[in-house]
Amino acid sequence: SQFYGYDLWNIYEFPFLLRGTPQLRMIQIKFPQDFPVIIESKSMKLYANSFYNKDFKKQDQVIQRLKSDLKTKMLTPDISFINKFENPSDNQIINHENIFKFEGFRSICPVTSQPDWATIYIYSKTNSLDRKFLNKFLLSFREQGDFHESCIIQIFNTILESLKSSSLNKKTHLEVVGKFLRRGGIDINPIRSTH
């Protein structure tokens, strides 16, 4: 199915040297949903930590280097230093009555076999979110070995098909957000939407 969205990566410990002085900054990387590869978080952690002894004259050079290293032939992710991460309260996230919030979502990392935990937010303009089905469906991921992005895409596609089959109007609006907890200094937050 066609969808829109992005994967928001927050790297909480990004070390480098700025004119010989050690720096430890936070970096945010926004990968478009159609980025041709899924980067494994352990690889990203090792890559980020490889900067600990690289010296730059200006901070902008760090961002330029990251963009150069991470771009593909067609796409370059948005990358920026940030001073603090936006952490919206539940009241900011849940401002619609048609939002289903599922805490304690669990899947298994296919590389390390470690659990990945998240809060999943599902929004639909229709009132046809079957909460009992959603609860059972999201619980079914508890032993599933898959990447964050793949889990959210599977959740999005399954719910979208369910909404389309239960609605006379085949144009339905759906958003699925996975706010995964940090592991190894990185959290990954996939977001998928019909538009």
Residue ranges and their predicted role:
Residues S1-H195:
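N-terminal intrinsically disordered, cationic/polar leader segments
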